[in-house]
Curated annotation (Swiss-Prot):
Pfam families per UniProt: OSCP
Family that this chain belongs to: Belongs to the ATPase delta chain family.
Annotated keywords: ATP synthesis, CF(1), Chloroplast, Hydrogen ion transport, Ion transport, Membrane, Plastid, Thylakoid, Transit peptide, Transport
Protein name (record): ATP synthase delta chain, chloroplastic
Record function comment: This protein seems to be part of the stalk that links CF(0) to CF(1). It either transmits conformational changes from CF(0) into CF(1) or is implicated in proton conduction.
Feature: transit peptide: 1-60
GO molecular function: proton-transporting ATP synthase activity, rotational mechanism
Originating gene: ATPD
Annotated GO biological process: photosynthetic electron transport in photosystem I; photosynthetic electron transport in photosystem II; proton motive force-driven ATP synthesis
Length: 248
């Protein structure tokens, strides 16, 4: 992690190596989220890249490494006074990395670092990412740790929430909720937790049928379930009739 802590203002990544020549069958990289990507080509692979290590020990190592990167980035954001903007940047990056093609491109061992940096540059310019976050992404490319990005985002959220006395509430619903409804939910979570601030993250899940759920607390340990799915499950349990299947 020494490379991340060389300066309190910016990250510095290594100079890009010569372009790696890729031979064999190729496919154009596309992104379903609407991001305009550079014209890059990657070699097709028959196996899918895994996002996780195996076992409890592997999970602990991933969490530890992600926490170290997240804390280093948080130190930079604090010194720059950009905690809020950095959090927003990481949320953008997390959504982009959800695309399987983008993620597999970044973690592929047969794609050269120069090509990966081209993709970083495109993401940075199209999503208005701050320079220190862009440098952070390039460091992950240098260190071959891009697969940790989602864990890093989670760890950074924890650091941000601690620094700002913020409670994170994840609201899951069938359809997008209106802003006034989310504001009411935020006030309710604030009363329950006593936190100074509440951040709302929204998730769409059609399996809930109707209503919504709210997860908050340490690692989302507390749940308020106001969904029709939960009500139907409770009714089924009381009647001992098993799962209720709804006609679509």
């Amino acid at each position: 992690m020494a490379a991340l802590q060389q300066t309190p203002i910016t990250f510095q990544s290594r100079s890009p190596p010569p372009t790696q020549i890729i031979s064999g069958p190729t496919a154009k990289l596309s992104f379903s989220g609407g991001l305009k990507l550079p014209k890059l080509t990657i070699k097709l692979r028959s196996n899918r890249t895994s996002r996780r290590g195996g076992g409890a020990a592997g999970s602990k190592m991933v969490a530890s490494a992600a926490g170290s990167y997240a804390n280093a980035l948080a130190d930079i954001a604090k010194s720059n006074g950009t905690l809020e903007q950095t959090t927003a940047d990481l949320e953008k990056i997390e959504k982009i990395s959800d695309d399987e093609a983008v993620f597999n491109f970044f973690v592929s061992p047969i794609v050269g670092e120069e090509k990966k940096r081209e993709l970083v540059d495109e993401i940075v310019s199209s999503s208005s990412i701050q320079p220190h976050v862009a440098n952070f992404l390039n460091i992950l490319v240098d260190m071959k740790r891009v697969e940790l990005i989602k864990e890093i985002v989670k760890e950074f959220e924890k650091v941000y929430n601690t620094l700002t006395d913020t409670e994170l509430a994840v609201v899951t619903s069938v359809v997008k909720l209106e802003s006034q409804h989310l504001a009411q939910i935020a006030k309710g979570v604030q009363r329950l937790t006593g936190s100074k601030n509440v951040r709302i993250k929204t998730v769409i899940d059609e399996s809930l049928v109707a209503g919504f759920t709210i997860r908050y607390g340490n690692s989302g340990s507390k749940l308020i379930d106001m969904s029709v799915k939960k009500q139907l499950e409770d009714i089924a349990a009381q009647l001992e009739i098993g799962d209720i299947q709804l006609a679509v």
